[in-house]
Amino acid sequence: FSDPLDMIAMDDLSIITGMQIEIRVTTVKDVSQALDRFYGNSEAMKVADQFAAERREKYGNNKDGKEESEEVKQAPIVRLVNQIIEQAVHKRTSDIHFEPLENQLRIRFRVDGVLQEAMRHDISLLSAMVARIKIVGGMDISEKRKPQDGRMTQIVDRQEYDIRVSILPTVYGEKIVMRLAQKTALSRDKKDLGFEPEELHRFEDILKHPNGIMLVTGPTGSGKSTTLYTALSELNTEEVNIITVEDPVEANINGINQVQVNAKAGLTFAAALRSILRQDPDIIMIGEIRDGETAGIAVESAITGHLVVSTLHTNSAASTISRLADMGIENYLISDAVIGVIAQRLLRRVCPRCKRMVPADDLEKKELGIPEEKWGEEVLIPHIEPNEECLECGGAGYKGRIGIYEIMQMSPALKRIIATGGTAEELEKEAIKEGMNTLVMSANKQVLKGITTLQEVHRVAYDN
């Protein structure tokens, strides 16, 4: 039995939790049920044990004795959350969604850009899971009415993963989304980005400029950060001072000065950029241009002798110029500052085990940009025959992704169109004349190579 007069214990609890302690009388049974519900849920224990058994069967026991012993000692809910993250990593997941429904907790994994249901559990697991994730993510465990953001790390198969956490109150409980990123995965060799030879040449040419602004554009999850970090790795030498301002810092790069935006402390993108300009930078990376003030400072920095790389959310390379104009940047400044724009998407690769090459019909040949006079020639394109038991893709029909790009390298003709207020359509037409592939053109090449399907092109690049 507890002692309601133990003031020392009450003070200790108050300090640890940051809350005021109130004494209540209850039964041992109610206390046990509360502990089981929030910290030792029998459902969590059952699911955690099931996960452990499945992992041993599928992957073998790749943990040493000490790791295995420590895992067994963990509370069931701790084991369960860790095992869900581990399973997500093994399935190449970018985001984990914990979604409270009326009577169930649905967990979905975003694999290769598409959400897939991974499991469902009893809704009673939700509160304990939320509490565990809030504690590890550095969030307020008592706040359930407001959205919260946090960050945590976890080691899976001896690789460290950075996990960004977002929690949103919904009618059935708090919804959690975890974004997983392997700390070493963002920076890669430029040849591994999936550029065609001509595109790689254009990319290298843009990075050779001592000043100007290079913009990478596309929707969330299109690989913009990977392209930016790869560019920075290319530029990172002893002779240059590189400073980044990011929200959040997605990966640490040795030799580069990285600044984390902190709006609560008044450190916005614009405020950070003003300070960075007093730090004698050669190259500046801005995680995202979100407003006119940031855009103005970025363009001014590019014109005054700095190389600036950043991202925007637009659908195409040409429309990026219009977006800057909409933010209040004068056309002559855009023309002077911008040295190149890269629009990009990620297409799913067709699973080699589920792929079957079939002749394209006339409509498909037309979509692929094949001239009508060549429609009589046989053209083979991939179709999927999904197999639920496929060990490569698990029945999805796709495994892995490849980048497609639209690289608009500035030329005197393009600069004239921008300076005179030309439209995005005029810009794109001139860029194509100068050799630029649009996203759809790049995607069609991957279909003809047998790497992806026309259905995937429709899903990802059809709006272009």
Regions found by a protein language model. Name each.
Residues 314-411:
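Cys/His-rich Zn2+-binding cysteine-cluster or related metal-binding knuckle/ribbon modules and their
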Residues 1-44, 53-222, 438, 445-464:
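N-terminal "pre-motor" subdomain/linker immediately upstream of P-loop NTPase catalytic cores
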Residues 120-127, 193-197, 266, 314-318, ...:
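Short, conserved loop/turn and helix-capping segments at secondary-structure boundaries
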Residues 373-464:
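NTP-binding/hydrolysis catalytic cores, primarily Walker-type P-loop NTPases
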Residues 200, 204-215, 225-349:
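Switch/coupling sub-region of P-loop NTPases
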Residues 12, 16, 34-37, 132, ...:
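Alpha-helical scaffold elements adjacent to nucleotide-binding pockets in ATP/GTP-utilizing enzyme cores
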Residues 90-91, 157, 278-279, 304, ...:
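Charged, alpha-helical scaffolding/interaction elements associated with membrane systems
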